[in-house]
Amino acid sequence: MKKTIIASSLAVGLGVVAGNAGHADASEAQVNKAELAQLAQSNDQSLNDSPIQEGAYNVTFDYEGFTYHFESDGTNWSWNYAQSGQASQQQDVSAQASTVSNQTSAEQVGSQQQSSQAQPTQTQQAPQTEQTQQPQTEATTSNSSSSNNNASSGSSVNVNSHLQQIAQRESGGDITAINPSSGAAGKYQFLQSTWDSVAPDEYKGVSPAQAPEDVQDAAAVKLYNTAGASQWVTA
């Protein structure tokens, strides 16, 4: 998955602190690897809206079988991740491969709807996203076969063995678990935005940790079947 952004230089607080002004690489910055990895894996919109820190930086790190890269020249920024050692194959099994081109500067945001006041030499384009979904050809293993489906403890939902392993790694099977750092919650450690995309209407906007186990299981199965195991860093 690779994202390339051309937009404002506003930073979001994602746990990255520049070691020196201007340019920072992996050795010059203190990186919250777990949080950045979780945001990248879940295709969090905040990574597209703004860079992870102000100024130019070049941050690359490996985390749990994937290599992550975040880069900015101070104006344009990009981020991507791939399975370690298989960067060229990642696009083939990725649930989502998106390219975002945003040519709106911070000074132009307020005047996007006032085309009559645009400078003749400036071209303003609203952010556009092209998303391509590829079938999961390598990400899932034989563990996801129907012969291995079993209802999880305390739930009537059939959860395949791969998802059960993910739940154990993410939360130890605790349906009320909450990560105070990233805000991920529940048995499968959903981010709120991801949860809202797969949860039943009555549980949208509610913390996953407050939903019954069978509701969490059903949401996880839906996400697994539509987006693949790559949605979880521990997969």
Swiss-Prot record:
Record-level GO cellular component terms: extracellular region
GO molecular function (one): hydrolase activity, acting on glycosyl bonds
SUPFAM superfamilies: Lysozyme-like
EC assignment: 3.2.-.-
Biased composition (Low complexity): 111-159
Keywords: Glycosidase, Hydrolase, Secreted, Signal
Disulphide bridges: none
Superkingdom classification of source: Bacteria
Cellular localisation: Secreted
Region of interest: Disordered: 90-159
Keyword Plastid found: no
CDD domains: RPF
InterPro entries per the UniProt record, alphabetical: Lysozyme-like_dom_sf (IPR023346), RPF (IPR010618)
Function: Is able to cleave peptidoglycan and affects clumping and separation of bacterial cells.
Family: Belongs to the transglycosylase family. SceD subfamily.
Protein name (Swiss-Prot/TrEMBL): Probable transglycosylase SceD
